Amino acid sequence: MFPMVTEFMNYGQQTVRATRYIGQGFMITLSHANRLPVTIQYPYEKLITSERFRGRIHFEFDKCIACEVCVRVCPIDLPVVDWKLETDIRKKRLLNYSIDFGICIFCGNCVEYCPTNCLSMTEEYELSTYDRHELNYNQIALGRLPMSIIDDYTIRTILNLPEIKT
């Protein structure tokens, strides 16, 4: 008789515990019910990136001294720097600079350690293409400034969405 009573008490305790856990989960679900949705309609609405967002790298050809610090600090030795030594002035002259964004991990080491600040991170993150060879950017493609999301009048950002009346 006593084992049957203890089994019944254990069953009751387990039922109460399970009901409490289900109730806690339901309360969390209900707490999210009155919040605004986070989902955006991507091609037409975009989130504004933070100041420290690590997007596509912008390169300024005139500032580069071809020191190759960016290549040495890159964990995958990605930037390709072609230069020629000018013997009359004893300086390097930059011929070509390219980065393959299909391989780049956007760590930002090249930007951080560049002594002349010729590299900077932009807020551009739309780098998708149908051919991965198009992701190999040379100094001309790297030098183009991206259109700012805030300044683009065709795109609605979260800041300029119409107010939702409740």
Curated annotation (Swiss-Prot):
It is an enzyme of class 7 (translocase). One of its GO terms (molecular function) is quinone binding. [4Fe-4S] cluster 1 binds at residues 64, 67, 70, 114. It catalyses: a plastoquinone + NADH + (n+1) H(+)(in) = a plastoquinol + NAD(+) + n H(+)(out); a plastoquinone + NADPH + (n+1) H(+)(in) = a plastoquinol + NADP(+) + n H(+)(out). Binds 2 [4Fe-4S] clusters per subunit. [4Fe-4S] cluster 2 binds at residues 74, 104, 107, 110. InterPro entries: 4Fe4S_Fe-S-bd (IPR017896), 4Fe4S_Fe_S_CS (IPR017900), NADH_quinone_OxRdtase_chainI (IPR010226), NDHI (IPR004497). It comes from the Eukaryota. Keywords: 4Fe-4S, Chloroplast, Iron, Iron-sulfur, Membrane, Metal-binding, NAD, NADP, Plastid, Plastoquinone, Quinone, Repeat, Thylakoid, Translocase. PANTHER family: NAD(P)H-QUINONE OXIDOREDUCTASE SUBUNIT I, CHLOROPLASTIC. NDH is composed of at least 16 different subunits, 5 of which are encoded in the nucleus. This is NAD(P)H-quinone oxidoreductase subunit I, chloroplastic. It comes from Aphanactis jamesoniana. The lineage of its organism: Eukaryota, Viridiplantae, Streptophyta, Embryophyta, Tracheophyta. The gene is ndhI.
